[in-house]
Amino acid sequence: LVSSSEALLDANRADLWDSGRINTNESVNIVYEGVPLIAGQKCFWKVRFSDEQGNWSSWSAPASWRMGLLADDWGAQWIGSEKMEAQSVGGRKVNNVMPDPWFRKTFNLETIPQDAVIYVASVGYHELYVNGKKVGDAVLSPSVTDHKSRARYMTYDITNYLQSGNNVIALWLGTSWSIFPAYQREDKPAIPMALVQAEIILPSGKELQITSDESWKTHASPNTLLGYWEAHHFEGECYDAALEKDNWNAIDFDDSDWEQVKVYHPALKVSSDRTEPNRLIQEITPLSIQEITPGVYRVDMGVNYAGWFEMQLKGQPGDSIVFQFSEREKDVCSYGIHSIYKVGPKRKGTFCNRFNYMTGRWVQISGLRYKPTIDQIRGWMIRPDYRRSGGFECDIPLLNNIYRTTLWTLENLSLGNYVVDCPHRERCGYGGDALATTRTALGNYQLGAFYNKWMEDWRDVQEADGNVPYTAPTRIGGGGPSWSGFCITLPWEFYRQYGDIRILSESFPTIQRWLDFLETKSQHNMLVRWGGKWSFLGDWLWPDAWSERSAMEKQGKALGDTRETLFFNNCHWIYSLETAARIADILGHKTVAATYRKRASEIRKAVHTTFFDSRNNSYVNGYPSYLAIALMVDLPPENLRTKVWKRLEQEILVNRKGHFWGGITAGSFLLHTLLDNHRDDLIFEMAMKEDFPGWGNMLEKGNGTLFEDWECRGSALHSSYLYIGSWFIEALGGIRRTESGYKQFIIEPWITEKGPQQVRSHYNSMYGNIESNWAVNSGVLNLEVTVPANTTAILKLSDIDLETLKEGDSIWKEAKGVSLYTQKGKAISLALQSGTYRFSVTMNSGLQ
């Protein structure tokens, strides 16, 4: 039921939509089919369901949503400060000198409103205040977006903030992304701007609208961005407490000396920020404070993180206290990340970031007249407020540590509702890096809104000729076809995880145009090198990449010039075409799907003929990652596949001595090829290595996060090798999807003598929580499986004594909800209906 008011919903009167009883097994991704809705409308809904016997559940708790605004619904104008323009000298960027602006608008209400909502779009970050109080607990809002084409607005319910009589709406804007060079255009100056529209309904039914226009007032705030918001120059903030104006956002504040705002007219699409906002997720407590030289203190925050640093301070007016943040214990400052607090006439105050954020573990503080104490300092890890959906734990500490560190690293890369390569140096949403993070992220977090937003960013940045940049929404940085090809990978992986076909239909035009663009870069059924030094990249940051790259540069070559790069990029082209064909099939575009498959077949033949090494049953230099992608895209003919697989095993176990040998992009294909083909023995061998190259080596040298490169030379908080995070629940827990959205799934844990002997894992799907918990003791496997309502599972067990297989106290054949699916030798597959099952069976392998 969907109603226009809570009262109607309570009375079961659905004036907007009553679906009636629908006989279907679909219970997620249900599309609204009721009365057409209007802008700003609030809708209240609830649902109930019946089982196969016709027994009805109780009604769900009431919930609601509010409709957003379309382009024609906006009556507001973009406003900014005429005095705040980005500075440059002779065309060269210089550090920002614009203070972050304050805006105010006062107005009168004849009575307390019945309902009031305000929409705030901004170029750059914003904070909203009504009558002196900050609205909501979101920070660094809105989500990062491509300000060359779009701005996102936040929706705030301010009913309880308003009063009868005088009121004030105030904004604090952050310069931040407003001056990002890639976002500039002639009709949009490099300044923070806001678009504000409040819709107020009084008890009488009278409707009022407060909008941003030339009547608003502005003044410089005490906060100023440091740097100029570009790679290597994100820096921090300077807060000058001498410039504070108490109660600047209060009703009775005297703003008579404030300037009028200036109205601007940027041609930006304005869209709702339909994601979980950034919030203060976790408080970080420092471990220690050390005085390294007289008056200079070094704080160890205990873990590398991205977010805010907060400290209570005191001093003499004019004192400048400098905070420098670093990822490494011996470094004073990493990537120029630093902030400044200038003491004001009150002689005390609190520094905390507001419109920027820091990254690091250590903070070097200078300018104090006293030794600080731990209780004066805290940090805040910030990310969008999405929820965890997956969990894993086993009896091998190294694997638990890799899993936890992978997820902590990922969370610290997601601030702004896109996944960055690193949060300090570049802050770019690289598509190549996303190959390493997406499957891990989807398998461990509820990220429907997050990835829907990021896919919209990728559609936004596509160029007129069909090319897709290597990053979104940031539009800068190097890469190659596997970076741009994320415009295919993302909607496909999203659909597989959530079963929502809409992201496929919305993204398919982008996919088609990009594949058309690739055809313009091909000759004789293969892509050829195009672009400059940082284009046409293949794999990136594999083990020993630094030395190989240095040797090439001495020869005047770039990474895009190598035979291995040409091979990988053409294999990825096949992968892109085959994935696009699957998407086309689902959307009903059968002719298009057939065309893509035919094209992939032509390219496959050309690539195999050009690159296959028949003497070694290998491709190019034989790196495992290149053999893996060849197998994933069916490059070797059927009569050669077994030989190439054996070569891959030899490369891993013998030539690489059991170490992982792949970079960001090709490495993701190595991990996922092995995972999808149940070669968990090989993944386990590589995951357990504690020397170079390996995750264990990173843990030994790191600060609770994973590095940019296997050598641990670059960034210490990076996205490069997070693909390992997809292995734990899928393989060791054995929870694998067979139908999109986990309508049907497999439980097939990897159980072997050399692997874990105890595992607890779960994935909270849209249908409910899936659990796979197992342990082997004295040769007996005990396995607990939970199958959510309206789903089915296939439980696969091998190398067992079938005569001893029980569910609870019953033999499996008599267990309710359990039926035989297939049986072959010592292996059995059972079909499970919804419910919780406890199986026990003797293992033939002699596991202890």
Name each region found by the language model.
Residues 1-42, 46-424, 432, 449-450, ...:
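Extracellular/oxidizing-compartment recognition motifs
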Residues 97-98, 301, 428-429, 481-482, ...:
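Short helix-capping and inter-helix turn/linker motifs at the boundaries of alpha-helical repeat units
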Residues 116-120, 130, 308-325, 353, ...:
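Alpha-helical support elements that line or immediately flank enzyme active sites
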Residues 124-125, 195, 211-220, 372-405, ...:
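Active-site acid/base region of carbohydrate-active enzymes
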Residues 193-197, 211-247, 273-282, 598, ...:
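Non-catalytic C-terminal accessory modules of carbohydrate-active enzymes
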